């Protein structure tokens, strides 16, 4: 059974095609912007044009636009191919990648994940040595994130900045990569495919209802409730 993975939560857009535990093909591009234009050609360049029985897409937290682009493509392909649609938490993939890299050089250790967020904030997640989330991710100012980060090992796009801000620790600059999905605990692949932006949009619907109230249900895949 083939699995197509779509990762658009950050400035790095990546895709991968697996058959069981074997990577058939994949690519990653650091774009900043332009995920919508790049994603479909990247999928089409995969073996068999990326067609698969299952599709996994990054659910965030991350870029509003990138997450929506990834999910829209995943839903369209799942409908066209009659494929199963799954989602996974972005920061958990970064943590899994960091744990794999760190364990090759030292004993397993907890990891804090710090990624670029919106409005100058950072997404911060805390993970155990096995990559399991210890709490839901938060969107914090850089100063607050530096204070809140628990682990000596910090991974993500803002890892170096966080380590510099607090004055200690080891930084692994990592962006989520679809080609590394098999590092993630399979239990984190969820059939509940709902985006988690990590912070509430600064907008209200007519009548004053916060847009965030329509986007969040408080449940983060793989995190304690």
Describe the function of each predicted region.
Residues 26-31, 59-63:
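A short glycine/serine-rich beta->alpha loop
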Residues 43-54, 103, 147-152:
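Phosphate/pyrophosphate-binding loops at sites that engage ATP/ADP/AMP, CoA/4′-phosphopantetheine
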Residues 56-85, 90:
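DPxDG-like acidic metal-binding loop motif
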Residues 16, 28, 54-58:
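Short, conserved beta-strand segments within well-ordered enzyme catalytic domains
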Residues 41-45, 75, 79, 100-101:
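Short, well-ordered alpha-helices that flank and scaffold nucleotide-derived cofactor binding pockets
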Residues 1-23, 30-37, 86-225:
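Oxyanion-binding and handling regions
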Residues 51-60, 152-160:
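Short glycine-rich phosphate-binding loop at a beta-alpha junction
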């Amino acid at each position: 059974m083939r699995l197509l993975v779509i990762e658009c939560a950050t400035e790095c857009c990546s895709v991968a095609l697996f058959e069981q535990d074997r990577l058939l093909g994949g690519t990653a591009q650091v774009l900043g912007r332009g995920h919508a234009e790049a994603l479909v050609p990247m999928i089409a360049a995969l073996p068999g044009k990326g067609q698969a029985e299952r599709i996994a897409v990054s659910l965030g937290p991350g870029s509003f636009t990138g997450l929506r682009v990834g999910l829209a493509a995943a839903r369209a392909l799942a409908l066209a191919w009659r494929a199963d649609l799954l989602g996974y938490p972005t920061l958990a993939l970064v943590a899994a990648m960091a744990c794999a890299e760190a364990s090759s050089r030292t004993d397993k250790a907890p990891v804090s994940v710090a990624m670029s967020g919106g409005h100058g904030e950072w997404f911060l997640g805390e993970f155990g040595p096995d990559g399991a989330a210890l709490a839901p991710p938060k969107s914090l100012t850089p100063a607050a994130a530096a204070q809140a980060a628990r682990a000596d090992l910090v991974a993500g796009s803002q890892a170096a900045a966080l380590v510099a801000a607090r004055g200690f620790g080891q930084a692994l600059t990592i962006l989520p990569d679809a080609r590394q999905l098999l590092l993630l605990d399979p239990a984190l692949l969820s059939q509940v495919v709902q985006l988690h932006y990590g912070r509430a949009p600064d907008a209200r619907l007519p009548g004053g209802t916060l847009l965030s109230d329509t986007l969040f249900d408080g449940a983060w895949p793989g995190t304690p409730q």
